[in-house]
Amino acid sequence: TTILLTNQILSNMFKHLNALFIGLALFACTSGAVAQTIKPIETPVPVRPAGQKDVVGLTAPKLDVVRVGFIGLGMRGPGAVERFTHIPGTQIVALCDLIPERVAGAQKILTKASLPEAASYSGSEDAWKKLCERNDIDLVYIATDWKHHAQMAIYAMEHGKHVAIEVPSAMTMDEIWALINTSEKTRKHCMQLENCVYDFFELTTLNMAQQGVFGEVLHTEGAYIHNLEDFWPYYWNNWRMDYNQNHRGDVYATHGMGPACQLLDIHRGDKMNYLVSMDTKAVNGPA
């Protein structure tokens, strides 16, 4: 009874506070007391092609052994290869990176785990396509620089592969819809590897919420702060630092938002109607 009463009180409180904040914001905008610019960004859903079904509940035929090919063995890739050496029912078939030494380094991970050497692809910016074209791979794991994520995933799905993509899976809305359309057409899984959603702590919290430990969830908060100073040398051609120097803000908001969305059943019975993004004055970053 206490929990239900508390939730009702909180619910009413948030409703009144929300109305108050909206009223204050409107007053500030119309009174001239505060100079601010509101720029709504529309993200319309394109017309879905006739006969094309969504993949929210997609199931694929069972695989006794999942054969995996990895593209990108710089910062994130080697750790992924190492993790797969511990997963029963998987086979690491192929490894690809532009730099041959990184492929060789990943091969050593397999050797250490007493696993056979995988096929190697390197030395060319198109070498990854040959990996995707193999007929003995079920899943392509993509851990390259961000701008190549979508095109690699689309190519892999078009060649009959499921794909798993490091965050972010795409850089533009056009790329996002291209991933969705390709997944729907090919009926292949296209999964964003959002580690801050699937880590132990987040999944434990989600399970507790789903079991009713917290009562009705009315408010969530999420954030992500990560000092990458120790890792800059591992990024090919300095791409990660270049991106940070040319952009500010949260460059992959799903780390903070993803777990919160899961707690609120977003896209599983509920949805976001709008998203508010606030900026601050640049100090050391780009203006």
What is the predicted function of each stretch?
Residues 5-21:
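Bacterial N-terminal signal peptides that target proteins for export
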Residues 19-29:
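Bacterial N-terminal signal peptides
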Residues 33-35:
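Boundary at the C-terminal end of the N-terminal hydrophobic targeting segment
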Residues 38-113, 260:
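N-terminal Rossmann-like dinucleotide-binding module
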Residues 72, 186-191, 196-287:
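Predominantly a Rossmann-like dinucleotide-binding segment in NAD(P)-dependent oxidoreductases
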Residues 94, 139, 219:
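Short, Asp-centered acidic motifs that coordinate Mg2+ and/or phosphate
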Residues 118-142:
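A structured beta-alpha segment of the ubiquitous adenosine-cofactor-binding alpha/beta core
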Residues 139, 145-146, 150-198, 212:
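Beta-strand-loop-alpha-helix segment that lines the small-molecule cofactor/substrate pocket
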